[in-house]
Amino acid sequence: NLIQLSNMIKCAIPGSRPLFQYTDYGCY
């Protein structure tokens, strides 16, 4: 689901760190 993925990506951005290190760091 692209909407869930998009929300997870937005929540996964912890500042200046690379996004791909936080693929399972999304909102739960």
UniProtKB/Swiss-Prot annotation:
One of its GO terms (biological process) is phospholipid metabolic process. Binds 1 Ca(2+) ion. The keyword Metal-binding applies. Ca(2+) binds at residue 28. It is found in: Secreted. Its cofactor is Ca(2+). Keywords: Calcium, Disulfide bond, Hydrolase, Lipid degradation, Lipid metabolism, Metal-binding, Secreted. SUPFAM superfamilies: Phospholipase A2, PLA2. One of its GO terms (molecular function) is metal ion binding. GO terms for cellular component: extracellular region. It catalyses: a 1,2-diacyl-sn-glycero-3-phosphocholine + H2O = a 1-acyl-sn-glycero-3-phosphocholine + a fatty acid + H(+). Is not toxic. Belongs to the phospholipase A2 family. Group I subfamily. This is Phospholipase A2 pseudexin C chain.
